Each structure stands twice: as structure tokens, then as C-alpha cells.
């Protein structure tokens, strides 16, 4: 049900008056001229990861009077840039500098520690703002859907990444690293991140922002071999060449690739797009060419190894004899049917058991519904939308992974978010959003206060940021992340 003040606005009018779909990329120099009644739009963005900040950035840049409030359930901003990017990839986190400039704008406000859907509903936000953009990402992981995945020792890659990156809800994970073999199901960049962190000499991580608890556990790790398993073949891997090259060059490790997995690929890659061709050529060289003298010597001294297993689909998690934890994974051997993007893996009838003491599932993230009033496609794991406009809910938009699914890199999300914000500005200019003033955060602040919720501001975050940087200086780290919500609130005097 739409809020009371929206009853006058029929969907038929929305769909009939809505501008034609915008171009597939933001127009260079895109700028809008707005009438007097449109000069102070109050806009709400839910989520402070890349999608949320890029949406806010574009809105503020292209509407000189818009005010944007960014709501975030965590106490701290930046989403997966803080909690998802690997600690040994600090250059990727430089985008935080841009987001900080956006948050410091006098027309932007960060409201952390607010759970939309619990502390405040989406209909309440829609009553308070001219437009609401949902940019809350994909915080769940795809289940394996096989027997035994509930066994101790089976961990989602998402939780493992959150553990070493300081996500508060993952700090009790305590992964058991006392085994010698780990298996990762999935062959995307997250899988390679996890494998790299497991195998990187701990001294190489000491000057990163990995949490001290995770670093301590990795120092005690006995994991020597990591298998990265995929249902399809080398031509279908989802990781990129940068991450593969890092694995091949990882100190103290050697790759294990089966040359038979690459038979006939040399001829088949001639017509594939250049990025895929370069990636496959690197795999081919690593699997089939004899290493040079220097590389052979390096590999001979390696105490750890990693390997790619292709054409294997998980069937069952195998328990220890006492049934108390994981002992291995049963894999169905597959073959490929179809061509191009429609290629799919089908079981051949053969199976093999791969022993391991740690099993990490990296088969994808998924979004969750945020509020009963918001349409959600559980199969696709996205909010149904047309170019960011939520279907049948005027004034409600979405951007990022909850809009298109959990794919792409940060620049993909940037383009996607710019398109959503451009659609919103077009609708505002066309008179399709509510006219007249809206209270914005003033109304929401009163609701939150009555419900005992104390938001965290961006200046509060900057105090926490300074504390983290200070704690890291003693050990030569860029920061030592605060991982306890209660400690963070205590430091802020909440």
C-alpha cells in the first residue's frame, strides 16, 4: 500500500507520462535544468557501498540543490570496499577518498547504525523524501543445496572474507586452519582472493589492514594445498587475468594444473574476445609449458600449492567418521553441452572424492528482500526494475547489485549507479515525482529517536577512522580495524 500522501498518484499516470528509456550510458556533460518547485529535492539512498555513494555523487553533481541522505546499517561506511576488497589490494580502496568527498558535502549526510526494514520502513522513507534509491547490495551467499553443507568446517567465502576484513558479524567465525588441504567451490575473483589469503606468507600481510585476529590465525595455519573447483572448463572461469597472475606469482607456492584440461583450447580461443583470450593463454602456458630455470627453481622451493579443478560439480559434503566435521567433498565429473554463453555442465555419471578439512563455498552472493512493500524476485535475487525504476512503485529506485545481480567490478557499479541517478533526475524534471517540500531526515530522525535508535554521522565515522589509523601506526599497518560494535559505540559516547 502506498503512503497516504501518494494516493493521488496513479500508476497509470506514471507509466503513461514516464519519459522514454534513457540512453545506455550517461550523457557526457549531462546536466538538468529544474523548475522552482523542483529545486530542493530530498533524496534518500539506502546503502553506503559503491552503488550508494556513486548514486549520491551523480545526484549531487547534476542537481545543484538536491540533498541526499545515505542510510547504512553498519556503524561505518563504504560497504564492500571496506569489507570485501582484499587487504593486499589497497589500490582498489583508493575510491574511499572520492566517497569521503561526497559524504563531506553540505548537501549530503551519512546516517549509520540504521537498519532500513527494521528501524524504519521503506514506506516511511517514501513519505519523508521525494525519491528513495535502494543500493543495499547482496549480503547473503548462495547455498550449495547439497547434503552435509551444515557440517562444521564448511564456510561461505563471503563470511571468510568478512572475517579477515573486520566485518563485525563475522568475527566469531574462527575458521579451523589446522588441516593441510582446503577446497574452494567456485572459480571467480572472490575464490582467488580467498585462496591467495590462505596461501600468502603471513609476513606479506603484516603491513595491510587485515585484522590482527585473522593475521594471528593465518600465522598458525597448516593449510598447504588449496583446490579451486569449477563446474565448467577453462574457457568459462569467472576470475580475471590480474587475479590469476597474482596466484601464479604468489611467493612460496606453485600451481597445479592438468594439461589434459586444456587439450584443443589453442584453436578454440582464436575467436573469443581479447580479455578472455589473454586469460586462457596464460592458463595454457602455465599448464603446458615447461617453466624456465628461475621459475622452476622457485617452484621447487615452494612449500605450498594451489590448483584448479575443472569439470567438477559438488554433490555431497563428506563427514569425518564421527560425523562431527567435514572430511571431503564428493564431486560429480561433468562435461559441457551447448556453445557460448549457453554452455552448461552436465554430469557424466562418474564421481570422485576430494579430501579436505576446510570447505569454502564461493558460488555467488545474493540480495535479500528489505521490506514487504518492495517488490523482489527471489529467483533472480534482484528488485524488479526498468533502468533502475522499481516496477509499479513510483519514486522508488535501485542501483548496484540489488538492481542487476552480484556481478561486475566497482567501475561496473559506478556506471550502473549513474544510470539510475540519471533516470531519477529525468523523472524529477518531467514532474513525475511529488511536488512541494518534503521533510527528509527531520521526519526520520523523530521516528528513530522515538524507537531508541541513535544514528552515527560521518563525523562520528571520522573519529573511528582516526582511532583505527592510530592503532595501526604502532605495528606499521595503515589501520587496525575496529571490529566490536560495542567498543565503537563506546568510543563515540553512544
UniProtKB/Swiss-Prot annotation:
Write down which residues bear the modification named Phosphoserine.
Answer: 313
Q: What InterPro entries does the record tag this protein with? A: FAD/NAD-bd_sf, FAD/NAD-binding_dom, Ferredox_Rdtase, Ferredox_Rdtase_adrenod
Describe its membrane topology: Peripheral membrane protein
Which interval of the chain is the signal sequence?
A: none
Q: Which GO terms describe its molecular function?
A: ferredoxin-NADP+ reductase activity; NADPH binding
Q: Does the keyword NADP apply?
A: yes
Q: What does this protein do?
A: Also acts as a ferredoxin--NADP(+) reductase essential for coenzyme Q biosynthesis: together with FDX2, transfers the electrons required for the hydroxylation reaction performed by COQ6.
Name of this chain's protein: NADPH:adrenodoxin oxidoreductase, mitochondrial
Species of the source: Mus musculus
